[in-house]
């Protein structure tokens, strides 16, 4: 982002529940990062994702599963992007995107959580109320249980 593009009311893009990190590695396009996509890369193309940064399209499966699948395949991070063909079906011209239609403009970025909840509600209090003084699992507990990603993920426009 250029400094001139910043705005005090702009919410910077992030994926909730991923750890903060600065990583470097080779970038690999992994389609939707489904298990079958990653299997095809490994089996058909001999691609090992260990130490790689995966670039995945939004869609088909939950973003948290994309991150978990890449993590399980040995990746060190994930970049998630919206394919204009999926989110701007009429084209990306101003008259074809929000606020004139329901479709995401090119400057739009999907945001959301990447945790895979053990149960509905607050991930740190699965199965019981999230009230003051209630017992809570730690982020480390949630990572050990597979509910929170261990690798960073970043959405882009």
PLM features: residue spans?
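Protein/peptide-recognition domains central to ubiquitin and immune signaling
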Residues: 1-3, 64-67, 80, 89-99, ...
């Amino acid at each position: 982002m250029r400094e001139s593009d910043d705005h005090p009311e702009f919410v910077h893009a992030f994926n909730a529940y991923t750890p903060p990190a600065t990583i470097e590695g080779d970038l690999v396009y992994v389609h939707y990062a489904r298990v079958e996509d990653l299997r095809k890369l490994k089996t058909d193309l001999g691609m090992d994702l260990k130490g790689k940064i995966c670039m995945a399209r939004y869609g088909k499966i939950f973003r948290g599963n994309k991150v978990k699948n890449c993590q399980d395949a040995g990746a060190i991070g994930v970049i998630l992007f919206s394919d204009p063909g999926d989110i701007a079906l009429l084209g990306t011209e101003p008259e074809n995107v929000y606020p004139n239609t329901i479709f995401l403009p090119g400057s739009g970025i999907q945001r959301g959580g990447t945790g895979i909840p053990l149960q509905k509600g607050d991930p740190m209090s699965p199965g019981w109320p999230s009230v003051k003084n209630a017992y809570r699992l730690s982020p480390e507990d949630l990572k050990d249980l597979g509910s929170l990603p261990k690798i960073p993920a970043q959405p882009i426009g």
